[in-house]
Regions:
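Extended amphipathic ligand-handling, pore-lining, and cofactor/metal-binding catalytic surfaces
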Residues: 1-107
Length: 107
């Protein structure tokens, strides 16, 4: 939620929302759910979507399959027009340098 707040401070002219991914089983999970939100946005007039997953350092099944394939399909089938996913940091040199600095603190 802090990440969302900081991003909102930088990008004041666009709507930014946090949703929660990876619920499993029948137990209640943090809300709003990503999948339900992606379905509902086109009905609220939001047809273009840019998604970022700052909770993930590297792309994985959740970002590649659940968000970029299943989520995109759900958004578009519900009336969305454009869906783009910003890749995670993955093997970006800045990301690797950050890990190096963090590890070097402890060795």
């Amino acid at each position: 939620q802090k990440t969302t707040r900081l991003i909102k401070e930088k990008f004041t002219k666009v709507e930014i929302q946090t949703t929660f991914q990876s619920r499993f089983g029948p137990q209640e999970w943090l809300t709003p759910y990503t999948d339900k939100t992606l379905e509902s946005l086109p009905k609220k007039g939001i047809k273009n979507l840019l998604v970022i997953c700052p909770g993930f350092a590297s792309d994985c099944v959740e970002t590649l399959e659940e968000i970029n394939i299943q989520g995109k399909e759900s958004f578009l089938k519900s009336g969305g027009v454009n869906f783009d996913l910003i890749p995670c940091l993955n093997d970006n040199s800045d990301h690797i340098e950050l890990f190096e600095k963090l590890v070097n603190r402890y060795i």
